[in-house]
Amino acid sequence: RGDEPVDEIRMENGTLSSLDAFANKYPFKKGIIGAVRHLTDCEEQTLGRLQIPMLRFTSETPIPVSNRYRTPKTLGSDRLAAVIGASSLKPGTDLLIIDAGTCITYEVIDARGNYWGGNIAPGMQMRLRALHEYTARLPLVEAEGEVPGMGYNTETAIRSGVLRGMKYEIEGYIKSMRSKFPHLQVFLTGGNRINFDTNIKNLIFTDKYIVPRGLNRILDYNEELRTNSEKA
């Protein structure tokens, strides 16, 4: 409540079929669309039935940070929302935001609120699939299972190579960014964060709701701008 998440719903296969029931449970007053793809006509109709003000988050949307990314129109809304979500929790702080999802992204915002950009790397499932699909004989290995220091068969060699490789990659980014920002604090989010949140040295915060927090902050910020404009 307030700025804290109350509930969540996940809908697969590009459908919003469960949204009506969710809206009946929680009567929304306003909303924000942060989709990284274009919505289908069916999705647009479903959202229209909510009959609430809906902000579409685009590269033109006012945001409470300074976006220094050189190609803002190509910047994924989820990346920017993650930055804003972390910044809303730790304002005035140098931050590294690591989002371990389909891809793993590394974003940096400084204590003055300047977002400088970040890097994108293959996520866990993408790495596991690539080893299977781009080789002749390597199997598709599940992420769940033993992760020894050195693999003792092909399955553990692949799993350890991927998961430990990502762990060392994350730790390397933290070390590199802390050399530039000595007081840097780190957030880890994303669906695959649970594979790393207890194993990463110098990891400060984990929060599964960083992106929704950012979208909520953007929505509130635009409401504040509208209210102030009406008072002027």
Regions flagged by a language model, labelled:
Residues 1, 104-109:
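Short beta-strand scaffold segments in enzyme catalytic cores
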Residues 2-95, 112-232:
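Nucleotide/phosphate-binding catalytic cleft detector across ATP-hydrolyzing
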Residues 98:
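Divalent metal-binding pocket/active-site signature
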